[in-house]
């Protein structure tokens, strides 16, 4: 088959690759103090006080334990946060706490890990993951991303949130 005849298929394949690589969401991030509404239990079932995040920028990643892009993003976000003196929070929006614990062990994630019962997903209008909110030290969202972003993009977003 000549290359010209395969052009539509190649264009579609490239579009899928770019979409899978992640994209920045161009809508404004949610308004208001996110830390006032970021309430969910930790994977161990303990209560979480979101106000403990105040004073430093935070990356809040909404992930699924069965999403390979999410699993890949967790250690990259953790490294970006650690190297830029920021908090990192993983919010598992699907599955059970046991599944989340397996991902946390596999990725050696050391940040705060929460399990959402669907409340946060609905509140922030999350339809796909990974979805990341970058919060300033005051708890207000400065940026949001849909799809995997990688360490450098997340580090830049933390710097801009300061």
What is the predicted role of each segment?
Residues 49-71:
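Short active-site neighborhood of thiol/selenol oxidoreductases, capturing the structured segment around
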Residues 1-11:
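Bacterial N-terminal signal peptides that target proteins for export
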Residues 23-50:
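N-terminal "domain-start" segment that seeds a small globular fold
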Residues 104-138:
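Short, internal strand/loop/helix patches
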Residues 18-22:
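C-terminal motif of bacterial Sec signal peptides marking the signal peptidase cleavage site
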Residues 59-60, 88, 132:
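Hydrophobic beta-strand anchors of alpha/beta hydrolase catalytic cores
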Residues 83-85, 134-162:
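Thiol-/selenol-based redox modules, centered on thioredoxin-like
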Residues 71-107, 116-119:
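Structural microenvironment flanking redox-active thiols in thiol-disulfide oxidoreductases
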């Amino acid at each position: 088959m000549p290359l010209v005849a395969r052009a539509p298929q190649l264009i579609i394949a490239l579009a899928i690759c770019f979409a899978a690589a992640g994209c920045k969401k161009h809508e404004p991030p949610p308004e208001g103090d996110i830390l006032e509404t970021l309430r969910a239990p930790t994977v161990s079932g303990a209560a979480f006080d979101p106000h403990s995040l105040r004073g430093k920028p935070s990356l809040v990643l909404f992930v699924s334990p069965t999403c390979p892009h999410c699993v890949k993003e967790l250690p990259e976000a953790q490294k970006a946060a650690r190297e830029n003196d920021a908090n990192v929070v993983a919010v598992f929006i699907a599955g059970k706490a046991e599944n989340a614990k397996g991902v946390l062990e596999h990725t050696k994630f050391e940040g705060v890990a929460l399990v959402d019962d669907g409340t946060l997903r609905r509140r922030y209008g999350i339809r796909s993951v990974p979805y990341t909110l970058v919060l300033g030290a005051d708890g207000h969202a400065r940026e949001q991303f849909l799809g995997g972003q990688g360490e450098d993009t997340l580090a830049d977003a933390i710097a801009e949130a300061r």
